[in-house]
C-alpha cells in the first residue's frame, strides 16, 4: 500500500530540520547518568577532571572519555587557570546547552 502524495507532504512537514537533529544529538549525550552529572557539576563554574572523577567515584580516564564526547558536541570547553597551567579545567558552554535544550523542547512540543 502506497501513501497518497498529500499524506507524504503532510508527514514531511513534521520531519525534524537538520539543525534541530544536530542539537538533539548533543542533548542525547546527556541521557548518560555520568555525563548528566558532569554537566550538573559544571553548573557553578570550571572543574578539573581529577575533582570530577573523585566526586563521581569514577576512574579519571573514564571521566575524560565522557568529557571528550561532551566537548565534541560543543557542550563543554576547556581552559587553564592559576599557576598550574598543566591542569585542564572544563566548563559548560551555556549557549550550546541552551540550544540543545531548545531543540528537545521543539521536538517534544
Task: Annotate each PLM feature.
Residues 74:
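Glycine-centered, phosphate/nucleic-acid-interacting loop/turn motifs that mediate DNA/RNA or nucleotide
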Amino acid at each position: 500500500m502506497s501513501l497518497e502524495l498529500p499524506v507524504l507532504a503532510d508527514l514531511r512537514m513534521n520531519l525534524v530540520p537538520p539543525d534541530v537533529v544536530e542539537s538533539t544529538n548533543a542533548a542525547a549525550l546527556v541521557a548518560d547518568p555520568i555525563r548528566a552529572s558532569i554537566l550538573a557539576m559544571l553548573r557553578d563554574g570550571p572543574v578539573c577532571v581529577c575533582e570530577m572523577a573523585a566526586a563521581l567515584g569514577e576512574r579519571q580516564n573514564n571521566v575524560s572519555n565522557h568529557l571528550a564526547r561532551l566537548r565534541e558536541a560543543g557542550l563543554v570547553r576547556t581552559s587553564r587557570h592559576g599557576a598550574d597551567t598543566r591542569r585542564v579545567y572544563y566548563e559548560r558552554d551555556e549557549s550550546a546547552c541552551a540550544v540543545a535544550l531548545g531543540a528537545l523542547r521543539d521536538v517534544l512540543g
